[in-house]
Swiss-Prot record:
One of its GO terms (molecular function) is magnesium ion binding. HAMAP family: Succ_CoA_beta. Its EC number is 6.2.1.5. It comes from Macrococcus caseolyticus (strain JCSC5402). This is Succinate--CoA ligase [ADP-forming] subunit beta. SUPFAM superfamilies: Glutathione synthetase ATP-binding domain-like, Succinyl-CoA synthetase domains. Residues 9-244 form the ATP-grasp domain. Its cofactor is Mg(2+). Heterotetramer of two alpha and two beta subunits. ATP binds at K46, G53, R54, G55, E99, C102, E107. The gene is sucC. Pathway: Carbohydrate metabolism; tricarboxylic acid cycle; succinate from succinyl-CoA (ligase route): step 1/1. One of its GO terms (cellular component) is cytosol.
Length: 389
C-alpha cells in the first residue's frame, strides 16, 4: 500500500526524523493559509499523487510570495500530471503539500529495502541525490553504498555512521544524518514497511539535515495490524478494479494489454502472461484467484476483468490442487451466462476434479474453447482475439 508524501512526512516527524515544516492543502485558499503559518521567504508547493517524477513533470513549484503560492495552487489543483510512473493517462492532482523552502547545500539518496538475496533489510545511500536511483545504479553503481542489517540487533549506529561517511556527508552533519537513519529504520520496522526512500535527503546552509521527500510502501500482508496506516489509504489514487478485487481477496493488477487472465497462484499467473506474450499476445491483467476460490469469487473475478474495456478475450488457466476444477468450471459458466459473455474464452483445467470440471464446461452450451496445456491455451486465445477483430 502506498501513501502520499505529506502523510509519510507526518510519520517521519512523529518518529523524530527531521522534515521541513508544512501541511496539506485541498484548495488555493488553504494553500495560502498553510503558507501564512510558515517562515516567510521561499515556499514549496508540491502536487500529491502516488507517483514519482513529479518535479520533472511540473508538479513541484517554488513560490516567493503568498500570491505565487495561490497562483501555483490554482495551476496544480485539478491538473492531470503525467510522469514516467503514471503512464500516459496521468493522475489528477487533488491535494498539495505546502512547505518551507530551505537553503540546499547538497542532495543525497537514502533508502531502506528488503533484500531477498540476504534475507535482510538493507540501508542504501548515495551522494547522487535528486536523481532516479535506478539511473545511478546503471551509470555509476560504485556510488551506491549498502549496509546489511542484522534482524536480531537492528541497524547499529556504527553502520549508519559508516554509510554517512561513504556518501560524503560533512563531518559536522554526520550525527544528524545518523539520527535520521536510525529513525527511518524505526519507522520501517514498527510500521511494517516494504520500502522507504528519501530522495533527496539534504544538508542545508545552516547545518541541518532534512528529508525533503518521503516515499513509504507498506506490506499489504501486515495491514491487519496497522490500523493507523490503513486510515491513510487514498482510494482515489488506486485503480477501481484493484479496489474491487481486494474486497474479494483477489490479487489483481491492471496491465496495458487486451487478453484478460484468470489464474490460481502468482507463479502460474506470471508464467501464463509470459506464454501469452510468447505467442504474440498482450495480457490485460494479472489476476490470482488464490487457492480458496468459490463460485461467487470466480464470478466477481470475471466482472473485474470485463470492467476493463480493452479486454477482447479471456484465458482461464487453473491447476487444481487445493482449488477444485469443478468449482472453477461452475464459476466460469455462471459468470459467462450472467454477464452474457460475447468475447472469446479459452479455459485450461488440470488437477483435482478435472474431469468433472471439463464435463461442466462441455455441457454448458456456451462457446468455451478448451485447452489441454498452458501453451495451447495461450496460443488459442491469441489466435481467437486476432480473428475476432
Amino acid at each position: 500500500m502506498n501513501i502520499h508524501e505529506y502523510q509519510g512526512k507526518e510519520i517521519f516527524r512523529s518518529m523524530g526524523v527531521a522534515v521541513p515544516n508544512g501541511s496539506v492543502a485541498y484548495t488555493p485558499e488553504e494553500a495560502v493559509e498553510v503558507a501564512k503559518g510558515l517562515k516567510e521567504g521561499v515556499y514549496v508547493v508540491k502536487a500529491q499523487i502516488h507517483a514519482g517524477g513529479r518535479g520533472k513533470a511540473g508538479g513541484v513549484k517554488i513560490a516567493k510570495s503568498l500570491d505565487e503560492v495561490e497562483s501555483y495552487a490554482k495551476e496544480l489543483l485539478g491538473k492531470v500530471l503525467v510522469t514516467h510512473q503514471t503512464g500516459p493517462e496521468g493522475k489528477e492532482v487533488k491535494r498539495l503539500l505546502v512547505e518551507e523552502g530551505c537553503d540546499i547545500k547538497k542532495e543525497y539518496y537514502l533508502g531502506f529495502v528488503l533484500d531477498r538475496a540476504t534475507d535482510s533489510v538493507v540501508l542504501m545511500g548515495s551522494e547522487e541525490g535528486g536523481t532516479e536511483i535506478e539511473e545511478v545504479a546503471e551509470a555509476t553503481p560504485e556510488k551506491i553504498f549498502k549496509e546489511v542489517i542484522d534482524p536480531v540487533v537492528g541497524l547499529m549506529p556504527y553502520q549508519a555512521r559508516r554509510l554517512a561517511f561513504n556518501i560524503n556527508i560533512p563531518k559536522e552533519s554526520v550525527n544528524k544524518a545518523v539520527k535520521i537513519m536510525l529513525g527511518l529504520y524505526d519507522v520501517f520496522m514498527k510500521k511494517d514497511a516494504s520500502i522507504i526512500e528519501i530522495n533527496p535527503l539534504v544538508t542545508t546552509g545552516d547545518g541541518e539535515v532534512l528529508a525533503l521527500d518521503a516515499k513509504i510502501n507498506f506490506d499489504a500482508n501486515a495491514l491487519f495490524r496497522q490500523k493507523d496506516v490503513m486510515e491513510l489509504r487514498d482510494l482515489d489514487e488506486e485503480d477501481p478494479k484493484e479496489i474491487e478485487a481486494s474486497k474479494y481477496d483477489l490479487s489483481y493488477i491492471a496491465l496495458d494489454g487486451n487478453i484478460g487472465c484468470m489464474v490460481n497462484g502468482a507463479g502460474l499467473a506470471m508464467a501464463t502472461m509470459d506464454t501469452i506474450n510468447h505467442f504474440g499476445g498482450n495480457p490485460a491483467n494479472f489476476l490470482d484467484v488464490g487457492g480458496g476460490a468459490t463460485k461467487e469469487k470466480v464470478t466477481e473475478a470475471f466482472k473485474i476483468i470485463l470492467g476493463d474495456e480493452k479486454v477482447e478475450g479471456i484465458f482461464v488457466n487453473i491447476f487444481g490442487g487445493i482449488m477444485k476444477c469443478d468449482v472453477i468450471a461452475e464459476g466460469v459458466v455462471a459468470a459467462a451466462k450472467e454477464l452474457e459473455l460475447t468475447i472469446p474464452l479459452v479455459v485450461r483445467l488440470e488437477g483435482t476434479n478435472v474431469d468433472q470440471g471439463k464435463e461442466i464446461l462441455g455441457n454448458s452450451g456456451l462457446a468455451i474453447t478448451p485447452a489441454s496445456t498452458m501453451a495451447e491455451g495461450a496460443q488459442k486465445i491469441v489466435e481467437l482475439v486476432k480473428e475476432a477483430k
